[in-house]
């Protein structure tokens, strides 16, 4: 007998019929056209190398890529076999060379990786782009190792096509609680005194420790084994794109890049070869039509961990104003 699902469990589950309906919303490789207007805001089901060769050059403002890490894994009938370091580098070079021509001259690219593949990703990226930074984010999930340090970090490499690129610093500040408020002539210095507490909006660094891996009580959660959180990708998208820009994810997975792009009023193109992942992506995109909230992003800023009570106390009026500002 199947154990009933807890009311608090928000993991996306769909019937076979629902799956068919959502899959029908995707477009196949033979439907891909060089006319950008025909493929924008679409999930393309197919091999990313085949699809990338069909996309128009100089058409993408931002690329967010989460390629397979160099591990032998099988998920939902899709297998990636671990390669030697030279072979994985050749694989990386193959898809990056395809993408380089698609990015606009003022465009940016972010590539996710683990510690083993990070040096390869960084090296190959530098052959095609100007590498700007390496972001390391704390990944608090998984068991510890018995004869090694627990793997609790992942990297995201940030690069640009040229020296002219978008970076919206004010859009990605983090609101942190002020432990020792400092005043000048009785006036708060570099911090805000609010009914929720004393806070300072700080500039983001290249180390992110405020990310939560999606889990069963989060509405964005799917059964995808390596799903990235909406908060993680929203930082990237807010920083390196503007409303109306086109964002490409060549390894879409369960759709986080497309979903966040939609919530933040950007356009998206997602490529994914696994049909089940495409189904989850389309379901999440549908939900994004009625719920544009992003966990941990409230009042136009990102909040540090363990600040839910302060976030929740923000009035509905304040949230409505923030949503209006986001649409501008």
What kind of feature is each model-predicted range?
Residues 1-280, 320-328:
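Core catalytic lobe of class I
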Residues 276-328:
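PRPP-dependent phosphoribosyltransferase catalytic core
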């Amino acid at each position: 007998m199947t154990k009933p699902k807890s009311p608090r469990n928000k993991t996306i589950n769909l019937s076979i019929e629902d799956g068919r309906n959502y899959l029908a919303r995707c477009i196949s490789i033979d439907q891909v056209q060089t006319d950008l207007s025909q493929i924008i805001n679409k999930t393309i089901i197919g091999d990313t190398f085949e699809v990338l060769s069909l996309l128009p050059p100089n058409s993408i403002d931002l690329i967010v890529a989460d390629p397979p890490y160099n591990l032998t894994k099988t998920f939902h009938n899709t297998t990636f076999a671990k390669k030697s370091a030279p072979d994985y580098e050749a694989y990386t070079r193959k898809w990056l060379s395809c993408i380089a021509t698609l990015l606009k001259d003022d465009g940016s690219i972010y590539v996710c990786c683990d510690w083993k593949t990070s040096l390869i990703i960084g090296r190959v990226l530098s052959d095609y782009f100007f590498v700007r930074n390496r972001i390391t984010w704390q990944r608090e999930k998984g068991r510890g190792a018995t004869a090694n340090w627990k793997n609790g970090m992942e990297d995201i490499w940030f690069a640009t096509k040229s020296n002219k690129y978008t970076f919206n610093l004010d859009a990605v500040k983090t609101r942190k609680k002020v432990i020792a408020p400092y005043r000048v002539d009785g006036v708060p210095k570099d911090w805000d005194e609010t009914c929720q507490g004393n806070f300072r909006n700080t500039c983001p660094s290249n180390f992110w420790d405020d990310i939560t891996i999606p889990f069963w009580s989060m509405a964005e959660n799917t059964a995808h084994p390596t799903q990235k959180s909406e908060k993680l990708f929203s930082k990237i998208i807010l920083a390196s794109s503007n409303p109306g820009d086109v964002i490409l994810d060549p390894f879409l997975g369960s759709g986080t890049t497309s979903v966040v792009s939609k919530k933040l009023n950007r356009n998206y193109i997602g490529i994914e070869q696994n049909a089940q992942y495409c189904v989850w992506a389309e379901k999440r995109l549908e939900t994004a039509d009625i719920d544009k909230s992003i966990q941990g992003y409230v009042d136009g800023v990102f909040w540090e961990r363990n600040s839910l009570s302060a976030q929740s106390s923000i009035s509905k009026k304040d949230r409505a104003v923030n949503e209006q500002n986001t649409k501008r």
